[in-house]
Amino acid sequence: ASSAASDVYKRQDIIHGIEDACSDDALWLIPSIVEYIKETGEIEFADQIVPYADKGEGTVYEHMMRILDFSAKEVGATGICLGLRADWNDCLNLGGGESALVSFLHYWAINNFIELAQYLGRDDDVKKYKEMATHVKDVCNNELWDKDWFIRGITKNGKKIGTSTDKEGKVHLESNAWAVLSGAASEEKGIKAMDSVKEYLATPYGIMLNAPSYTVPDDDIGFITRVYP
């Protein structure tokens, strides 16, 4: 985990060795570190000094805060996290657009971090990140909910991906699964979202990532529209 933390950049626009960032990468590190500390009991790990990938150094705990603050800052016009170079689904063209998945992942990571901060007695950080979590949750529920499910994101041109009016790519798995897994969705919305996943995405062979399948290329949405159904 400390090796992974050293891949966090003090300059936060550099990931994967290029001058831009994948919006989800660093966020996965937060719950990984928290779970590592829980399992091992190595509380002192949070204060271990590790270098940043570009220059300088900081504690693992400071790296975690830097990650959360970066995602809080890198948001679009609606307040949803920017997709930057890519999120988990590299086939979506979210450069300049906004990612529902990353906002839900951000919310999940914040709450994992709060648990650690509470255990360490860092009350100022608990207060700061509880406020951040409340804001992220409110934005997600206000901006991403569409009738019976959560949309997948918003392109740089303002087109919403995965809405009730879309003929193709109407429902996407990642945003709805993570709305529930993260705890950001209310019970009512979470149940509706999972009912929609069952209705549109569940098959005898597993759950599809989106449906109905894309058949018409749309470069505003991305390469996902060019992948064979």
Regions inferred by a protein language model and the residue ranges of each:
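Hydrophobic, small-residue-rich alpha-helical packing segments that form membrane-like cores
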Residues: 60, 87-111, 115
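Core alpha/beta catalytic barrel or barrel-like domain that forms the active/cofactor pocket
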Residues: 6-7, 43-51, 75-89, 211-214
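Single conserved hydrophobic/aromatic residue that forms the stacking wall/gate
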Residues: 1-5, 9
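Hydrophobic core segments within long, regular secondary-structure runs in both alpha-
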Residues: 3, 30, 34-37, 50, ...
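Solvent-exposed loop and edge beta-strand segments that line ligand/cofactor-binding
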Residues: 13-24, 91-103, 158-182, 225-229
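Hydrophobic or amphipathic alpha-helical targeting/insertion segments
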Residues: 19-50
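Catalytic cores of carbohydrate-active enzymes
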Residues: 7, 105-223
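The substrate-binding groove and active-site-proximal loops of carbohydrate-active enzymes
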Residues: 13-20, 48-58
